[in-house]
């Protein structure tokens, strides 16, 4: 990638985020890498520490993005670690005001606070015997490789898994039923990771419990799937794959068609 300027630039551009998307990625990061490991180890959640961790990550990523360190020779996401970030305004020479940054931080703090206060999330997370955050689920359908990455999968000894998808949106107007249905389908049909419980095989996609958590509004939304929903997911995958094929027909490179991500 580093030897091909066009591919390198495409890599840069693929990592750029808006301020609004960035605040959500920080919330994802803190929940996935700070909160979930503590819950798996049955440690108490200390709100003040979590906010401090989030603030430090906010500052580290802001500095990384401000100086466009993603463009340093040899810089990779792995090398940068959790400080890795790239923001549109910095890359395009646009202004980010203190008001913009203050609002972004306020939203991050509010989202994390609401997460800790939402019993619809915290109670099942404490009841689960194993939590898996941001794990890729791969399966094949209709000659396509499908990849889904749920925010969180909660496994229980005697209950079907719960998939939690959190959003950091000021106005929760969109319905994410299809996205969650894709996750449920992927969980059941994927090649299980080594740490997934053997009991997963006893469940069907329609058994999976689904929770969408709007972290800025503190509103939970539950979804129950039917066989018709699962048929709709598979039809959606087929249609999406066909549209991608039509979009890239002018380019014969097969790697453009290798994977669909949801």
Language model features: what each stretch is:
Residues 33-38, 186-193:
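Active-site catalytic microenvironments for nucleophilic, acid-base chemistry
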Residues 129-190:
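Non-catalytic protein-protein interaction segments used by genome-maintenance enzymes to assemble
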Residues 19, 23, 104, 176-179:
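Hydrophobic (often cysteine-bearing) scaffold residues that line and stabilize catalytic clefts
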Residues 30-131:
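A non-catalytic, helix-rich entry segment at domain boundaries
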């Amino acid at each position: 990638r580093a030897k091909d300027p066009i591919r390198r630039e495409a890599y840069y551009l693929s990592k750029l985020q808006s301020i609004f998307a960035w605040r959500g990625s920080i919330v994802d990061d803190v929940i996935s890498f700070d909160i979930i490991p503590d819950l798996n180890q049955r440690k108490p959640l200390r709100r003040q520490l979590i906010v401090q961790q989030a603030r430090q990550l906010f500052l580290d990523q802001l500095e990384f993005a401000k100086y466009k360190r993603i463009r340093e020779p040899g810089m990779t996401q792995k090398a940068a670690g959790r400080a890795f970030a790239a923001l549109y305004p910095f890359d395009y020479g646009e202004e980010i005001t203190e008001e913009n940054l203050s609002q972004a931080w306020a939203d991050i703090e509010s989202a994390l606070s609401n997460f800790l206060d939402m019993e619809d999330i915290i109670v099942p997370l404490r009841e689960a015997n194993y939590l898996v955050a941001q794990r890729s689920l791969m399966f094949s359908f209709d000659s396509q490789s499908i990849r889904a990455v749920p925010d969180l999968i909660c496994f229980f000894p005697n209950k079907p898994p719960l998939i939690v998808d959190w959003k950091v949106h000021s106005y929760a107007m969109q319905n994410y039923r299809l996205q969650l249905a894709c996750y449920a389908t992927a969980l059941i049909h994927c090649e299980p990771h080594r740490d997934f419980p053997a009991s997963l095989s006893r469940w069907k996609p329609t058994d999976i419990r689904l929770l969408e958590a709007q972290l800025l509004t503190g509103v939970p939304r539950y979804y129950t799937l039917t066989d018709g929903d699962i048929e709709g997911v598979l039809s959606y995958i087929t249609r999406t794959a066909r549209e991608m094929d039509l979009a890239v027909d002018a380019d014969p490179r097969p790697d453009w068609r290798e994977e669909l991500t949801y």
